[in-house]
């Protein structure tokens, strides 16, 4: 039943003008919700500042103008052009046999001659690497009680075997209460409530970034702390205890995610789309466990000194003072 419903959406959607108008209102409300949440908005601002006018630099939700100007024909033509069998991946997790799933999917997708559709696979271009040699600051004025910042730089691409070391480095720097930045910014100085880091991998590049929300009067101090911590780790690496804690946290998070069938389904589907194969879960855990202090020192020394980009949402009208901090 579920496969029938989903396959019907994929193969036989009519996409009426009424449907588009109804969804347009929903997306506009989603944009409004994003704009009212500075901690969310700052990530889109960072992407725009870092990647500029590229596919990955533009907001996934679109803009108010682009959503308002989107016609039914635009949506329908995109659907007919992109929703093709050669780009389709079906991922299923649960108590069901693989052969039965294959038979059900083939039967469902054979309707309306969907499997006979021809077309070129969707182009997945490499993500552009930031090529500016100058640091950049993206600033969005918003009258708020807190300043929200995202400080990031170039990371590794998704096919880079160092992505496991990058994940451990990210966790050690800002992955939890024992992480270096959390301790320095929140526990020692009480400058922020929310402090975290994450690494993202794309086709041709990646991003390693750090978020903090703080009192606007303390924003420069927080930026300076981030820079000092990253500089220290780039020069000296991290302690054995920090690395082992981070590895344990990354492994634990992955294991817990596999308790849910939906998460398992998402993992194998994304693996197939991104890598063309499903990486064995135990192999992933082993790859994380193999990350050494030398790996962390090398990747930190290479990437934490990259030219930074800083995105800020808060009651600031001039980015010059932040540019001066980055230039030091």
Spans of features found by a protein language model:
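M16 family metallopeptidases and their MPP-like homologs
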Residues: 1-10, 41-65, 87-93, 150-156, ...
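Active-site-adjacent, His/Asp/Glu-enriched structural segments that form or flank metal-binding
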Residues: 1-38, 76-84
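Hydrophobic side chains in well-ordered alpha-helices
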Residues: 2, 101-104, 181, 222, ...
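Active/ligand-binding-proximal structured segments within catalytic/core domains
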Residues: 4-6, 46, 83, 151, ...
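Acidic/histidine-enriched alpha-helical segments
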Residues: 13-31, 97, 118-130, 228, ...
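An aromatic/glycine/proline-enriched structural segment found at the starts
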Residues: 52, 56-61, 65, 84-85, ...
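Active-site glycine-rich loop that binds ribose-phosphate moieties when present
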Residues: 67-77
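Short beta-strand/turn micro-motifs at beta-sheet edges
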Residues: 76-80, 136-141, 194-200, 299
